[in-house]
Structures are given as structure tokens and as C-alpha cells.
Amino acid sequence: MSIADKLKTIAENEQKVFEAGKKSEYDRFWDNYQDKGNRTDYGSGFGSCWTSDIFKPKYDIVPISAYMMFNNSKMAIDLVEHLEKLGVALDFSKATSTQYMFQSSSFTRVGIIDVRASTNSRPLDSTFANCMKLITIDKIYLKTGAVGEFNATFTNCVALENVTFEGSITKNGLNVQWSTKLTKASIISIVNALSNTTSGLTVTLSKTAVNTAFETSTGANNGSTSTEWTTLIGTKSNWTISLA
């Protein structure tokens, strides 16, 4: 074997040793941080110090406490896509505490938010407040009949376009007036989720979003007076649907 070949072999072996060392450190860190997949308390678990290069969990994340879990995260990524590439699931179906979960974070997309197991009277309290880069929430499963007020849930969600609700909205406080880019499908989902059995309650939407989504022709910007819109909100006459 020539000297050049020997040097090449040494370099290749060094790289293999280096990669093995990195894998060992990765395993050691995440085995400890996630308790080998048994961790359930993720309160404030992934805050402002985490980057997408570091946030590469080894195990599925199934929190019981998700309080402030991603609060103030600076990761401006599609969270769903990021975790799918890692083969890791994020499952909130057992979470009993979800307040402030994504507050002031920089994610562009989050997946399924399930608050049906919540034991808090306000499970969506400030959950997405000040998420100014958030475009898509795949779905929010509501705890029908037990969800408290939507206190500041979507405050300053100025980029939000897509959100789907599953369940019934039975309390005051849902306000998405900052979300001027909401799609027609998202607005319809909100209206359809409004309880048919409550009365005297108010929901606030963006007039700009409604005007654009329900406009009668491109550029007309008249959706809030369109027949389609008035017919839709007519199905929820027990609610005050305010446009701001």
C-alpha cells in the first residue's frame, strides 16, 4: 500500500471514529434528557436557547406537562417537517397543561394540538400569543364543553393563514383579529366550531381576512357583505360574530 493510500485509510478511519463519537454523545444526551423515552414533564423544555441543529430528539415526545414547552423558541422552522425527518412524533393527547406552550415562538408550522386531556380551565391560554411567524396550525382538538376562554390564544398571530378546529367552541374570547391572512377554509372551520347551544357569546375575526376570503370576485374585497358570508354566519345566529 502506498503512503498516499495509507494516509487516505487513516483519514477515513478517523472520520469513522469521529462520527461514532458524535453518535455516542447524541445518544447519551437524549437518553438522559428524555429519560430514554419516558419523560412526560416537558414544561419549559425547549425554550429560547434551543436551535434546530440541537433540537433533534431521539424519542417520541408525549408530554403530560407541556406548560411553556416551546415558549420563546427562536427556531423558525416547520416543526412538523423537522420532526418527521427525525422519525419522531409529537403527541399532545395526554397533555394536562398546555398554556403558553408556543408563546412568542418562531415556528412557521405546528402540527396537531390536542387539549382534550387538559385539566386546566383555560388550556389555550396564550398558547400561540405573539407567534408572529406562525402560518399553519394543522388542527386544534378542543375539549368539548370544558374549554375555558380563549384568553390571548392568538394575539399578534399576524402571519396565521391555516387553522382547523375539531370540537365545539362554547366559551367567550376567541379573537383572531390580527390574522388578516386567514383562508376561507380556516374561517369556515372557526364558524362551524361555534356551539349551537350557547348564547350571548362573541367571537372576533379579521374584517380584512373575511373581505378577501369571501370576496365575490378577484380584488372586490367585499366578502363581509357577500351572500356566502352572511349565509354562513346566519347558521350561528346565537353568536355575535364581530369583525375588527
Where are these regions (language model features)?
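Short, low-complexity N-terminal tether/leader segments at secretion or assembly junctions of large
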Residues: 1-28
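Negatively charged
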Residues: 18-244
